[in-house]
């Protein structure tokens, strides 16, 4: 009998599906974080494969800051309706009442209150003991050293010195009362593999990933797409149409576009093959001098 050899992408797919099923078998109340980006779309696709023909055995959670791109909100609602999964949307109402926003309070405070604290609120509100996320090790240095099962204490804090060994594909999911884990099924994927998989599996993604002429403001070296009227232009600033796309998506004032002509998936893949920069170069929160990604994770960030 001829032995079938899996391609590299098929091996990654099998590993991710194994992780998804393992967590559902081990944990009482899991949830999948849904940030609406390309990695979330791939993770959702893998989850639907993992539990086909049944429905997803967990809800999806979107932590809404109120500052996502309008196209992201449209895509989120359309996807939830098309696939019929349970979608939970949580917003930090206290932060919203305080008027917290990235322009007035800066990226660090905005992220801490509207994302980190909001996520912790949702974890406590629904009593989730495991949360899937689409982070990958190739994205950023603190994520590179994080385990697939990332253990958090009862305050949702991550201690990089207190991690469990993961030998081969064996994961220790034992937790104490009040503790939880963050699970990263895409840990071993790279950005180019994500795009190749999206192309091969014909996965729907937010149109912002494709190049198009968009209203752009250049500020502090970032190409900011003006998505609504909540921005005040500084002296000498102008908005002009530029051909851009996004490699990563987040709050629109904190997410920089890249100049590009890639309007199809093959074009994006070609562009990625010659790119020498990280996709997260366009995320303002990663450049906060006093609040690195590791510090955010120690405070409870995903």
Curated annotation (Swiss-Prot):
Molecular-function GO term, any one: sulfate adenylyltransferase (ATP) activity
CDD domains, per the entry: Sulfate_adenylyltransferase_2 (cd23946)
InterPro entries the UniProt entry points to: PAPS_reduct_dom, Rossmann-like_a/b/a_fold, SO4_adenylTrfase_ssu, Sulfate_adenylyltrnsfr_sub2
A Pfam cross-reference name: PAPS_reduct
UniProt-listed Gene3D superfamilies: HUPs (3.40.50.620)
Catalytic reaction equation(s): sulfate + ATP + H(+) = adenosine 5'-phosphosulfate + diphosphate
Example GO BP: sulfate assimilation
Keyword Membrane part of the UniProt annotation: no
Superkingdom field: Bacteria
Annotated metabolic or biological route of this protein: Sulfur metabolism; hydrogen sulfide biosynthesis; sulfite from sulfate: step 1/3
Enzyme kind, highest EC tier: transferase
Annotated keywords: ATP-binding, Nucleotide-binding, Nucleotidyltransferase, Transferase
Documented EC number(s): 2.7.7.4
Annotated family: Belongs to the PAPS reductase family. CysD subfamily.
Function: With CysN forms the ATP sulfurylase (ATPS) that catalyzes the adenylation of sulfate producing adenosine 5'-phosphosulfate (APS) and diphosphate, the first enzymatic step in sulfur assimilation pathway. APS synthesis involves the formation of a high-energy phosphoric-sulfuric acid anhydride bond driven by GTP hydrolysis by CysN coupled to ATP hydrolysis by CysD.
Assembly behavior: Heterodimer composed of CysD, the smaller subunit, and CysN.
Family matches, as PANTHER family: SULFATE ADENYLYLTRANSFERASE SUBUNIT 2 (PTHR43196:SF1)
HAMAP family given in the database record: Sulf_adenylyltr_sub2 (MF_00064)
Protein's name in the database: Sulfate adenylyltransferase subunit 2
Gene behind this protein: cysD
